């Protein structure tokens, strides 16, 4: 059994496969996922697990050099934005339109669907390198 925090086999596999500049997305229960994008559904019920729980878990193992968030989170969900900023520290944020975020899911290695039920709780993580 693994000793690390990420024990979901699908998430662990995607993280292990990530290269520099590859992307992994995490989102709320309502985010549409394009056909062809690997969807890892960890939602159990409304709110479980939360977006922040899943983000915290993934950040424990994935080296992230940049994140992408929807512009709309600034006004529609400032509490979630504050929680994200607290987790990512000095990692640069690029704000994009939500419609662009949905299109960019086509390029993601995978999308992790959480049980989150708050608006614009979606993020694209751009992989960095550890050297």
UniProtKB/Swiss-Prot annotation:
Active site: 20
Name of the protein in question: D-ribose pyranase
Pathway: Carbohydrate metabolism; D-ribose degradation; D-ribose 5-phosphate from beta-D-ribopyranose: step 1/2
BP GO terms, sorted: D-ribose catabolic process
Function comment: Catalyzes the interconversion of beta-pyran and beta-furan forms of D-ribose.
Signal peptide: none
Organism: Latilactobacillus sakei subsp. sakei (strain 23K) (Lactobacillus sakei subsp. sakei)
GO cellular component: cytosol
EC assignment: 5.4.99.62
UniProt keyword terms in alphabetical order: Carbohydrate metabolism, Cytoplasm, Isomerase
Main location: cytoplasm
UniProt similarity note: Belongs to the RbsD / FucU family. RbsD subfamily.
Chain positions recorded as substrate binding sites: 28, 98, 120-122
